């Protein structure tokens, strides 16, 4: 599985996630604006953090 792993609005980068079945994108807002984090897996998130998990290559941009 290949997942995007760039932060927020940086240029897209990807990494190969061996053994993973999900990519994730999570986002929240703070004083800097909207923060977006992407990577492998499907983490648990705190209340107030939005999470989208998906199962295809590069699905989490």
From Swiss-Prot:
Regions annotated as coiled coil: none
GO molecular function annotations of the record: ion channel regulator activity; toxin activity
Cell location: Secreted
Keyword Transferase in annotation: no
Main location: secreted
Distribution of this protein across tissues and organs: Expressed by the venom gland.
Disulphide-bridged cysteine pairs: 3-23, 17-40, 42-53, 54-59
GO CC list: extracellular region
The keyword Transport belongs to this UniProt entry's keyword annotation: no
Residues of the site described as May be the main cause for the toxicity difference between this toxin and cobrotoxin-b: 56
Alphabetical keyword list: Disulfide bond, Ion channel impairing toxin, Neurotoxin, Postsynaptic neurotoxin, Secreted, Toxin
Role, per record: Produces peripheral paralysis by blocking neuromuscular transmission at the postsynaptic site. Binds to the nicotinic acetylcholine receptor.
Note from the entry: It inhibits muscle contraction with an IC(50) of 0.20 ug/ml.
Family under the similarity heading: Belongs to the three-finger toxin family. Short-chain subfamily. Type I alpha-neurotoxin sub-subfamily.
Record's protein name: Cobrotoxin-c
């Amino acid at each position: 599985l290949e997942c995007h792993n760039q932060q927020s609005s940086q240029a897209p980068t990807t990494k190969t996630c061996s053994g993973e079945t999900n990519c994730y994108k999570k986002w929240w807002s703070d004083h800097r604006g909207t923060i977006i984090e992407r990577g492998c897996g499907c983490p648990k998130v705190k209340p107030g953090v939005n999470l989208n998990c998906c199962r295809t290559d590069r699905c989490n941009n």
